[in-house]
Amino acid sequence: MSETRDLQGGKAFGLRKAQQEERINEINQQFLDDPKYSSDEDLPSKLEAFKKKYMEFDLNEDGGIDIMSLKRMMEKLGVPKTHLELKKLIMEVSSGPGETFSYSDFLKMMLGKRSAILKMILMYEEKAREQEKPTGLPAKKAISELP
């Protein structure tokens, strides 16, 4: 029992999240300064939304979304995928040979012109938040509610 335990897990988690947010803000600034993306309208708010989404699914705060983080994201969206499909998704988005994709890869995919599966996933998540229109017959009204 010579190990020392860090009993301040919440504080350490907060520090890691702050460091992660700082790294992501630096990358966002690079994209804001890049003339290639200067024509995108409302770029700062898009980058802020992408940052929140990326931080939500980067479970281990290592700067990359791995296969388990992607699996969690897909299941949360109600679109579970097989291990092979997840590997293909990562290979499509990632610029390197690893089994993760970085925030820069994520931004290039989201701001790029090519269509990718993750772009559609985020679009479906936005649609899921919209209120569904009621179907079927309207509810019965009382006489006092009639015009």
Curated annotation (Swiss-Prot):
Is Calcium one of the keywords UniProt gives this record? yes
Q: Which parts of the sequence belong to the EF-hand domain? A: 45-80, 81-115
Name the keywords, alphabetized: Acetylation, Calcium, Cell membrane, Cell projection, Cytoplasm, Cytoskeleton, Membrane, Metal-binding, Phosphoprotein, Repeat
PTM (free text): Phosphorylated on serine residues.
Q: Signal peptide location in the record? A: none
Q: How does the entry describe its membrane topology?
A: Peripheral membrane protein
Molecular function in Gene Ontology: actin filament binding; calcium ion binding
- Specify where the region named Disordered lies, as residue ranges: 128-147
- Locate the N6-acetyllysine modifications and list their residues: K11
Pfam families, alphabetized: AIF-1
Positions modified as Phosphoserine? S39
**GO cellular component term, pick one:** cytoplasm
Q: Which InterPro entries match?
A: AIF-1_EF_pair, AIF1/AIF1L, EF-hand-dom_pair, EF_hand_dom
Main subcellular location: cytoplasm
Q: GO BP, one example? A: actin filament bundle assembly
Superkingdom is: Eukaryota
Say what the protein does. May play a role in macrophage activation and function.
How is this protein named in the record?
Allograft inflammatory factor 1
